[in-house]
């Protein structure tokens, strides 16, 4: 059986995936790869511009290709885009190649984090009902994909990172 030596962080936009994956990368001494950053590099465009010009379907296709390419290399921390779980193909890739950590966040926490960001293609502060519906539709996908779930509520990035490290040790002891 193939070892799941990549660690993929998943969760809704605003869950803290980018900040926490950066810190986790530093603490574990593993390179950090962001699916969104790889897409922006390949396309030469920002994520919001790709959504606007080419649509979500095109973006999701690019995201799948990037995830496949990233998973060709071992021992990485992968910062996944919030919607990566929406394609079954991506879930299969992650299950084969990654230990998946779901950063679970409460809707009110997400809303507070997102309301000041203008570069979120699927979020607008005036449409929190849309965010709630989107989150609700993705929750079962996040939970199903996760090997480990860590709540981010009322925790600093360092606290979440420590909890992930503890969970990784427990996971390795029970699965190895």
Swiss-Prot record:
Where in the cell does this protein reside?
A: Cytoplasm
Q: Where is it mainly found?
A: cytoplasm
Q: Which GO terms describe its biological process?
A: amino acid biosynthetic process; aromatic amino acid family biosynthetic process; chorismate biosynthetic process
- Gene symbol here is aroK
Q: What is this protein called?
A: Shikimate kinase
Q: What does this protein do?
A: Catalyzes the specific phosphorylation of the 3-hydroxyl group of shikimic acid using ATP as a cosubstrate.
One GO cellular component, as annotated: cytosol
- Organism of derivation: Dehalococcoides mccartyi (strain ATCC BAA-2100 / JCM 16839 / KCTC 5957 / BAV1)
InterPro entries in UniProt: P-loop_NTPase (IPR027417), Shikimate/glucono_kinase (IPR031322), Shikimate_kinase/TSH1 (IPR000623)
- EC annotation from Swiss-Prot or TrEMBL: 2.7.1.71
The positions making up the signal sequence are: none
- Copy the pathway line from the protein's UniProt record: Metabolic intermediate biosynthesis; chorismate biosynthesis; chorismate from D-erythrose 4-phosphate and phosphoenolpyruvate: step 5/7
What family name appears in the similarity comment? Belongs to the shikimate kinase family.
Q: Give the highest taxon in the source lineage.
A: Bacteria
Residues annotated as binding substrate are 36, 60, 82, 138
């Amino acid at each position: 059986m193939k070892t799941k030596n990549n660690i993929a962080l998943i969760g809704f936009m605003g869950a803290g995936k980018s900040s926490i994956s950066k810190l986790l990368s530093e603490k574990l001494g593993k390179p950090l790869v962001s699916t969104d950053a790889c897409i922006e590099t390949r396309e030469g465009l920002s994520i919001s511009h790709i959504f606007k010009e080419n649509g979500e379907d095109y973006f999701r296709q690019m995201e799948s290709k990037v995830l496949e390419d990233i998973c060709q290399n071992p021992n990485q921390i992968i910062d996944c885009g919030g919607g990566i779980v929406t394609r079954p193909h991506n879930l299969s890739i992650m299950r084969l190649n990654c230990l998946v950590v779901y950063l679970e966040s409460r809707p009110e926490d997400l809303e507070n984090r997102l309301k000041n960001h203008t570069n979120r293609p699927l979020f607008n502060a005036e449409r929190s009902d849309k965010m709630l519906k989107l989150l609700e539709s993705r929750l079962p996908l996040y939970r199903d994909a996760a090997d480990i779930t860590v709540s981010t509520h009322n925790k600093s990035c360092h606290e979440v990172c420590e909890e992930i490290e503890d969970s990784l040790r427990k996971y390795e002891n029970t699965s190895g």
